């Protein structure tokens, strides 16, 4: 199947950023040549339920944002760590449906950015070729 583009997900830790960089380089390699729609930072910060305005950067601050700038790809979003993601997921309710929450809004903003970047990519670039893996 041809790929419209790749979304690279990383956490802000240095080792995760190194892996994300390798992924970007792989997709941008002329043999693969799949456009990068952008990066998303997972576990960007921790926000406790009782202090929803506080942000604790447990794994580093804005590492994916810096990588996006360095690699010249869009930053599609930053998703915090909050207990409700796990709880709602376990209950079968995606966090994105909780539009009153900061996290639900972050997921919606990320989804909108993916749609925007996909539309931009499709308007500006030819369809990708099917990536063939040869033995």
Task: Mark where each language-model region is.
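Charged, solvent-exposed alpha-helical segments that act as regulatory interaction surfaces
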Residues: 33, 116-124
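C-terminal boundary of histidine-terminating zinc-finger modules
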Residues: 91-103
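Acyltransferase
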Residues: 105-119
């Amino acid at each position: 199947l041809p790929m419209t583009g790749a979304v690279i997900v990383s956490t802000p830790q240095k080792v995760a950023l190194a892996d994300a960089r390798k992924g970007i380089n792989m997709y941008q390699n002329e043999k693969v040549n799949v456009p990068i729609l952008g990066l998303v930072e997972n576990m960007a910060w921790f926000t406790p339920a009782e202090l929803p305005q506080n942000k604790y950067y447990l794994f580093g601050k804005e590492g994916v944002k810096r990588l996006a700038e360095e690699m010249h790809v869009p930053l599609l979003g930053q998703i915090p760590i909050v207990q409700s993601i796990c709880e709602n997921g376990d209950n079968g309710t995606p966090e994105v449906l909780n539009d009153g929450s900061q996290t639900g809004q972050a997921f919606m903003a990320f989804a909108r950015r993916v749609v925007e970047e996909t539309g931009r990519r499709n308007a500006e670039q030819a369809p990708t070729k099917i990536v063939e893996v040869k033995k």
